[in-house]
Amino acid sequence: MIMLTGGAISWKSRRQDCVSLSTSEAEYVAASQCGQEVLYLREILRDFGFAQAAPTEVYEDNLACVAMSENPVRRKFSRHIDIRYYFVRDLVAHQVMKLVPLRTHNMVADQLTKSLPAPALVKHRDVMIGRVPFCARSLCSATSVSGG
């Protein structure tokens, strides 16, 4: 889900086309697909005269996925991942987007992929429609992010 000025402007929820061997790989594939949308929307904003100087923050609840996006070395556990998904690394290296750790229970997009308890659903819905501001700065904590 991509948000601009407090409201969701783009979202997608579907099964992935490939089989992932780990949650980190699945998150990395999703981040790559998100990166394509980020690149497209940044170009639209630039065409309208709103060029983005800072990287677009993409919130991720999987620390291994964040680490893979920042490290250009292919490791033993990630060497089987299709090269096309390393598009994320290019976007991060060129400062188009940045993966930012966020606690799992604060992921607004979870309402598109998971069955949530009513209080969480209401909280995420209110953020998604812009009723309540999303303040990631107070929610982010690299030391307390849980995977999955």
Language model feature labels by segment:
Residues 14-148:
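RNase H-like nuclease module associated with reverse transcription
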